[in-house]
Amino acid sequence: MAKVSSKPPQLLDSARVLHYANVDKGVGFAGRTLLFVDGKELGKVPNLAICAEVSSGGVLLFHCSRAWKVFGCSAHDSVEAAKEKAERIYPGLSSRWVEAKASK
């Protein structure tokens, strides 16, 4: 069984974690993610991470399990755009983002 942690590792799928949030009971869910994996829409997840792709620096929003396994991701123009997208999916999430202290 995978270890459950509220804090992600420094890298997820070869991308450096910049910010992360735990989606707990106090956070809403809009009912739609509009993120499809293998032809099915991804539902509510317990963790989100905003990451910088190592080679390009592109911003990715990862939808993750409790153990930080990545289920799906979306690309964004900026960290702020990724946070705005996450807030549309999970109303009330904006105050829960934590800045990761990852080394470069």
Where are these regions (language model features)?
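Negatively charged, low-complexity tracts enriched in Asp/Glu with abundant Ser/Thr
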Residues: 1-42
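Short, exposed beta-strand "edge-strand" segments with a Pro/Gly-rich flavor and a Y/T-containing core
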Residues: 2-6, 71-77
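Intrinsically disordered, low-complexity segments enriched in proline/serine/threonine
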Residues: 10-11, 48, 93
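Mature, structured domains enriched in cysteine- and short glycine motifs
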Residues: 22, 27, 32, 57, ...
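Short aromatic-glycine-(Arg/Gly/Cys) micro-motifs in beta-strand/loop hairpins
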Residues: 42-71
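A short, charged, amphipathic alpha-helix used as a generic interaction element across diverse proteins
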Residues: 75-93
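Short, Lys/Arg-rich amphipathic alpha-helical interaction segments
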Residues: 93-104
